[in-house]
């Protein structure tokens, strides 16, 4: 695990302890049960069936490696723009300390459109999965670099029991082997090196030989141009999670359409 990931996970455990004190698990479960769900995987498959790229468009104000990406940050407006320009789903950062995200951003984005929403955070405990359901998420992220295989399997099973989709994220072939023990069809390959923070889309291409045909490869990070998109689609990678390229554009939805459609 990288130093930054170690620090983030330590903070997450502190946040979970504080959240449990303010909202016990059973109370949170009641909130979660009142939320409706949108079909995250189905939205991706519908784009594929129409011959299109399936874009999980990210709403992200900042990152540890790049700092603030977008000063004028109105999640509801960004969500509407993404929906109007062909996104399949949304991804919303809810981590506050490292990414300047927030639960309210996910709630605002989901209320502004009909797209399914991924809670983008560092999930290490079942409490966060109930939290995700309660805030209106339709899917969660599990990061293989942050979890051992048995815990990852347990968290996936719990998420599925609540009706949530799971995107499992890997950075290398060893993590892909772990991810392939899960049931989820969604395999995210993060092109960012966790130690150097550099990105290379070759990371995704180099792992395609490991992936069964019934899984959906989601390429993440470093997709910055139409050329990157074309390279991936030529390799039959048709699902993309993109944040930075859109967040830096004056009109995020228009940039999505320019890159993908």
Curated annotation (Swiss-Prot):
SUPFAM superfamilies referenced in this protein's UniProt entry, alphabetically: Ribulose-phoshate binding barrel
InterPro entries reported for this sequence: Aldolase_TIM, Indole-3-glycerol_P_synth, Indole-3-glycerol_P_synth_dom, Indole-3-GlycerolPSynthase_CS, RibuloseP-bd_barrel
Biological source species: Burkholderia cenocepacia (strain HI2424)
The protein's name in its UniProt record: Indole-3-glycerol phosphate synthase
PANTHER family with a match to the protein in the record: INDOLE-3-GLYCEROL-PHOSPHATE SYNTHASE, TRYPTOPHAN BIOSYNTHESIS PROTEIN
Keywords for this protein: Amino-acid biosynthesis, Aromatic amino acid biosynthesis, Decarboxylase, Lyase, Tryptophan biosynthesis
Keyword check for Amino-acid biosynthesis: yes
TM helices/strands, residue ranges: none
